[in-house]
Curated annotation (Swiss-Prot):
GO terms for biological process: anterior/posterior pattern specification; regulation of transcription by RNA polymerase II. Sequence-specific transcription factor which is part of a developmental regulatory system that provides cells with specific positional identities on the anterior-posterior axis. It comes from Gallus gallus (Chicken). The gene is HOXA7. Residues 186-219 are annotated as: Disordered. It comes from the Eukaryota. SUPFAM superfamilies: Homeodomain-like. This is Homeobox protein Hox-A7.
Length: 219
């Protein structure tokens, strides 16, 4: 056979394939919504027509089984108030009812009272109220003992400084020093009674100590 036979056969094949695209029109990159492809025309139509129920959006297959529970009807959102626990805020049908508003206000008021702290200076100090015994921490007692070792009597200025340093009031500092002086005098009195001293304390020294006590009381 001659080579012209193969050339003619190949040429006829490509011309037959090109005839498929003779009627095709050049379009843009975006596809039209109603355009149909020629290669999928008869096959796709036959497949879609053979199963009409599968491709029908209004078919019962696509109906949600949860439509009754999640519908926007008023019955799905009407929640009844719970009666077994009155302390928990409940959902009511009508949020504008005064009973629901009063329940929310009372709950907020109870929470505010629970979070409210009462400090010692906020408590009443009437004559009928019993005053509790003041307890000092180990650090406060140590610092007060050190100060008492050097000065048994404090001026008002020094008392204010110690009160700020130890987070105490001036009255607490004053009472502690008064009690500590009474204890110190009692201890020294017992020591002096057990071991008699050769010389009695002079009246001048006693008067000086009395003057110091009077000055502290005035401060």
């Amino acid at each position: 056979m001659s080579s012209s036979y193969y050339v003619n056969a190949l040429f006829s094949k490509y011309t037959a394939g090109a005839s498929l695209f003779q009627n095709a029109e050049p379009t843009s990159c975006s596809f039209a919504s109603n355009s149909q492809r020629s290669g999928y025309g008869p096959g796709a139509g036959a497949f879609a027509s053979s199963m009409p129920g599968l491709y029908n959006v209004n078919s019962t297959i696509y109906q949600s089984p949860f439509s009754s529970g999640y519908s926007l009807g008023s019955d799905a959102y009407n929640l009844h108030c719970s009666s077994f626990d009155q302390n928990i805020p409940v959902l009511c049908n009508d949020l504008t009812k005064p009973s629901c508003e009063k329940a929310e206000e009372s709950n907020l008021h109870n929470q505010a009272e629970a979070n409210f702290r009462i400090y010692p200076w906020m408590r009443s100090s009437g004559p009928d109220r019993k005053r509790g015994r003041q307890t000092y921490t180990r650090y406060q007692t140590l610092e007060l003992e050190k100060e008492f070792h050097f000065n048994r009597y404090l001026t008002r200025r020094r008392r204010i400084e110690i009160a700020h340093a130890l987070c105490l009031t001036e009255r607490q500092i004053k009472i502690w020093f008064q009690n500590r002086r009474m204890k110190w005098k009692k201890e020294h009195k017992e020591e002096s009674s057990s071991t008699p001293a050769p010389n009695e304390p002079t009246s001048a020294a006693a008067s000086v100590e009395k003057v110091e006590e009077d000055e502290e009381e005035e401060d």
